[in-house]
Amino acid sequence: VTHRLDRPTTGVVLFARTSKALTRLNAMFQSHEQIRKTYWAIVQTPPPTPQGRLENYLWRNEKQNKSIVVKPSTKDAKHAALSYKVIAQSDRYTLLEINLETGRHHQIRCQLAAIGSPIKGDLKYGAKRSNPDGGISLHARKIEFIHPVSKLPIVITAPIPEDTLWHTLENNIPL
């Protein structure tokens, strides 16, 4: 496995077939070069602007298995950056597309909660209610990278979860 998803998250997980490919993919993920990860998230409260960039410092609380936004001077704080844009809306929910620039513990969950837009179903980060399946409405939609051996561009896209709300919002994305 070249990267991880939080347990309640759905979507793309990338596996390497050889140790050589694993070593090269791990290096790409660590350097954040030649890898682009795109997530979709459903939030009840839309962010303050239809698109933006979030840049914070996160500190991981091991005991609570949670990250929080802190001052840059905080001991063990790590820089976290992502960009987002609203891609669809319904009467009660907003679908965001998120591109990670860094890959920190619970980064998307923590940064969206910090701007008042917790992910639907994410009780740990401020959602009012859990989802019926116990998951959260965060989906690893796509990974784009350069193949470590052939050097060809690869794009892997995961279908959205089989859920009425996901399908409703996907159908609301303008063409």
Residue ranges and their predicted role:
Residues V1-L175:
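RNA pseudouridine synthases
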